[in-house]
């Protein structure tokens, strides 16, 4: 039976979704602001499919949460559960381009071979110290504290480095009790601190000049194009929901700034 969600701020209904407490924390952080639902078509608010054998089909559910408000063009979270193991949270908070703010990005993925953890305040203009220095000064100590407690995720592809800060928290952790403990004791408090850092920057942000806004917009569009072109979830989404739906979802919902 399909769940009816009337708008993007309606609660996510996926039962036993691993990453629910992270989205709950995000919603709580926004609760002190005046927010509105972000316009998302019904076909992307809730999507259900099945995979596996005909004798033992497994359900996959994807729901999309989103909002907008002053200073924030779009905050959105793709929430997916496929079978008992595969679980995804892809959260991006995109500022309006007339504020000198980074993106907030959290990509948490559980697969049969482990958890992938990616957390950052991502720059629109990495080589511009007026855009980055005040962010990195706040974020680097937070990153140093938490990254020391988890294994590294490995090398970042060279073409992707311009879209990550030096405080990119990146890890691969195992399934089972060890991974569960790391998520509870390290990943969740790290996420909370990164989120608090972003909201501190958000509250302090002042409107920029038209010239600066144009520079930021170009940087944001470049970031969005890269994310859309290189989205690692594309293959998985296509296998669950088909090519046409997937390409529309990636380009018109997840990374929609043109």
UniProtKB/Swiss-Prot annotation:
Keywords: Oxidoreductase. GO terms for molecular function: cobalt ion binding; phycoerythrobilin:ferredoxin oxidoreductase activity. It catalyses: (3Z)-phycoerythrobilin + oxidized 2[4Fe-4S]-[ferredoxin] = 15,16-dihydrobiliverdin + reduced 2[4Fe-4S]-[ferredoxin] + 2 H(+). The keyword Oxidoreductase applies. Catalyzes the two-electron reduction of the C2 and C3(1) diene system of 15,16-dihydrobiliverdin. Belongs to the HY2 family. This is Phycoerythrobilin:ferredoxin oxidoreductase. It comes from Prochlorococcus marinus (strain NATL1A).
